[in-house]
Design a protein with these regions (language model features):
Chain B
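Sec-dependent N-terminal signal peptides
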Residues: 4-13
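N-terminal signal peptide c-region/cleavage motif recognized by signal peptidases
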Residues: 17-19
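N-terminal small/polar-rich segments of proteins
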Residues: 22-98, 130-171
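Short, surface-exposed beta-strand/strand-loop-strand elements in extracellular ectodomains
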Residues: 96-110
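Extended, solvent-exposed segments with strong compositional bias
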Residues: 112-133
Length: 122, 171
């Protein structure tokens, strides 16, 4: 059992993309008419330098949003916080906020990763 | 004298009470369970070329299967969808229509009891396989991809790349 756990630790997150929280929530921003949420993206993929953020409706259609960066470089083994602002008129339609890896160094076949958190009432 | 002793006593009681209340401060232990999904790429995979007209990630064809691991910290909070390639993301100019086939399978799980049904319960639509992650822990997935050039014509020489897309979506 311990050997299995050590094995998991050794191989764990060797090349990983993480996003949290699972269920972010909107709060009123200091800008009138805009709501804001914050998500955290962790980059432990050596083959990925940039991540794109997006807001989508229930059918994964894009929703207009504002962020300081919608495409942001995240160094290996570091994380970035994304503050995402959406007009209050679109809040009801915004269901997902997603981060997508931008692959730049793929030799033959690679894995593009996308993680989506969901806005919902808990 | 008596008044002074009484005053000292009152002050003492107040001090004791004050210090007692200071020691009785509630110390909050808070936690915020936010949950997260982690997609790890264990192996990027490579295409082998068993025939001039075929590229395949199958080890028997000289390729290497892409392997991903998905970790979730909340049960019943995520589904994960894998889409195997239906085109090259980069290639030389092709000389015929290329047909892609692909599949995704669970290759290992961290919780054999609660993840036993992942493979049988998956939903396959075209080249996308979707799994409901009903338990916390890690699941390993292996992906196969084969590209066959039309008319059994040889692939033009050059570098070919294709992506498997892994999506972890909160539900």
């Amino acid at each position: 059992m311990y050997r299995y756990l050590i094995f998991l630790l050794l191989i764990g997150s060797a090349n990983a993309h993480q996003m949290s929280p699972t269920y972010p929530q909107w709060s009123q921003s200091y800008l009138d008419g805009l709501s804001v949420t914050r998500v955290r993206v962790f980059n432990k993929r050596k083959d990925v330098k940039y991540y794109e953020i997006g807001v989508f409706d229930k059918d994964m259609k894009p929703i207009p949003f504002v962020s300081q960066y919608d495409l942001r470089g995240i160094n290996y083994n570091t994380y970035a916080m994304f503050d995402v602002y959406v007009n209050n008129d679109y809040i009801k339609d915004a269901v997902y906020v997603c981060s997508t890896s931008m692959l730049t160094d793929v030799k033959s076949s690679g894995v593009a990763s996308k993680i989506c958190s969901k806005f919902k009432d808990l | 004298m008596i008044k002074e002793l009484a005053l000292i006593g009152i002050v003492g009681v107040i001090s004791y009470g004050g210090s007692k209340s200071a020691f009785a401060l509630d110390i909050p232990i808070s936690a915020s369970v936010t949950g997260s999904c982690v997609i790890s790429v264990e192996t990027n995979g490579t295409y082998g070329q068993p025939y001039a007209y075929k590229l395949s990630t199958t080890p028997a064809d000289g390729g290497e299967l892409p392997i991903t691991r998905v970790d979730v910290t909340l049960a019943d909070a995520y589904k994960v969808a894998f889409t195997t390639p239906d085109s090259f993301s980069s290639s030389p100019t092709l000389n015929d229509v290329v047909t892609f086939t692909g599949d995704t399978e669970v290759s290992a799980v961290s919780d054999a009891t609660n993840m036993a049904d992942y493979e049988t319960d998956k939903v396959e639509v075209d080249n996308t396989d979707t799994y409901e992650l009903t338990a916390t822990g890690s699941t390993w997935f292996k992906h196969s991809s084969t590209a066959t050039n039309g008319g059994d014509r040889a692939f033009p020489s050059g570098n070919y790349t294709a992506y498997v897309t892994a999506e972890c979506i909160a539900i």
